Swiss-Prot record:
Gene Ontology CC terms, in alphabetical order: extracellular region
Top-level taxon of the source organism: Eukaryota
Protein function: FMRFamides and FMRFamide-like peptides are neuropeptides.
Listed name of the protein: Extended FMRFamide-12
UniProt source species: Austrophasma gansbaaiense
Main location, first listed in the record: secreted
Length: 15
């Protein structure tokens, strides 16, 4: 999942 991907964790933290 991109939301949990280290290289794309900005999506997960964008909340």
């Amino acid at each position: 999942s991109p939301a949990l991907d280290d290289e794309h964790n900005d999506n997960f933290l964008r909340f």
